Amino acid sequence: MANEHGILAQVRYAAREKILFLPHALRQMLRPDRMITRTEVCAVIERGEMIEDYPDDARGHSCLLLGHGEEQRAVHVVCAPKEDYLAVITAYLPDPQEWFDGFRRRKKQ
């Protein structure tokens, strides 16, 4: 993806300004079967890799990041850099039934 490094740099720059967790992200993070912490999401944003790019997303250019949280569990974060903050759209634990290659690629349906 030609703009891959550009959007990732924008994500990290926006996160240094401020991070806004959208209601959907908070609901997903607080599910009892997930319990994803803010610290885990921030670690994914700071050190994770971009695995999907959504330049035409209705919410604005966004991307899917993969990183690792507590006990090295895989965490996916969908986020969109804005002018003065990073919007965290959702965060979840990827399902091994839907992902392969270390949770980097979706299985074809």
Stretches found by the model and what they are:
Residues 1-109:
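Ribonuclease/tRNase effector modules and their secretory precursors
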